[in-house]
From Swiss-Prot:
Subcellular location: Cytoplasm
Modified how: The enzyme can be inactivated by further oxidation of the cysteine sulfenic acid (C(P)-SOH) to sulphinic acid (C(P)-SO2H) instead of its condensation to a disulfide bond. It can be reactivated by forming a transient disulfide bond with sulfiredoxin SRXN1, which reduces the cysteine sulfinic acid in an ATP- and Mg-dependent manner. Conjugated to URM1, a ubiquitin-like protein.
GO molecular function: peroxiredoxin activity; thioredoxin peroxidase activity; thioredoxin-dependent peroxiredoxin activity
PANTHER family for this protein: AT16346P-RELATED (PTHR10681:SF163), THIOREDOXIN PEROXIDASE (PTHR10681)
Function comment: Thiol-specific peroxidase that catalyzes the reduction of hydrogen peroxide and organic hydroperoxides to water and alcohols, respectively. Plays a role in cell protection against oxidative stress by detoxifying peroxides and as sensor of hydrogen peroxide-mediated signaling events. Might participate in the signaling cascades of growth factors and tumor necrosis factor-alpha by regulating the intracellular concentrations of H(2)O(2). Reduces an intramolecular disulfide bond in GDPD5 that gates the ability to GDPD5 to drive postmitotic motor neuron differentiation.
CDD domains in the cross-refs: PRX_Typ2cys
InterPro entries: AhpC/TSA, Peroxiredoxin, Peroxiredoxin_AhpC-typ, Peroxiredoxin_C, Thioredoxin-like_sf, Thioredoxin_domain
EC identifiers of the protein: 1.11.1.24
Effect of deleting the gene: Results in reduced resistance to oxidative stress. Simultaneous knockout of Urm1 restores normal sensitivity to oxidative stress.
Record's subunit section: Homodimer; disulfide-linked, upon oxidation. 5 homodimers assemble to form a ring-like decamer. Also exists as a monomer.
Active site (catalytic residues): C47
Name of the protein this chain belongs to: Peroxiredoxin 2
Amino acid sequence: MPQLQKPAPAFAGTAVVNGVFKDIKLSDYKGKYLVLFFYPLDFTFVCPTEIIAFSESAAEFRKINCEVIGCSTDSQFTHLAWINTPRKQGGLGSMDIPLLADKSMKVARDYGVLDEETGIPFRGLFIIDDKQNLRQITVNDLPVGRSVEETLRLVQAFQYTDKYGEVCPANWKPGQKTMVADPTKSKEYFETTS
């Protein structure tokens, strides 16, 4: 099972990137933050809502030096067929993020999200920092999708703590107060709360 503050499990495979097959690997993203999210299956129900939402927000992630990759145990051919299916028919349409094919199930297994009985991954989401260490891990059961806004906020918060060495309180957003992780200095933050 992957651990926070430790190197993310290396991966490599074929993805659909801008409508074509391309080999990608974790090390391609060194120097950038990366959101790697797993979803159960192509041509399903909750999955397209998440993938489309991440794709539509890809530019926001790129503005903060972060890329996003979706991954399932489907083949790259199935990914491409789903991308080429119109959204009004349950397809994805044009994508602004890569969809990684994990037909061998190795990536999902290495990240600890594979349901061994069904061969499909749970909805795992991993934030990997610019040094390729894991900073955040969440895993949802199959019927509930994830929040793109919360994922973006978490990346921003980790980047802030990396840069300034301060900690971010609950519900922190860029521009809001942070605190120094020190019993005395943290009081400056708490004095401003009600």
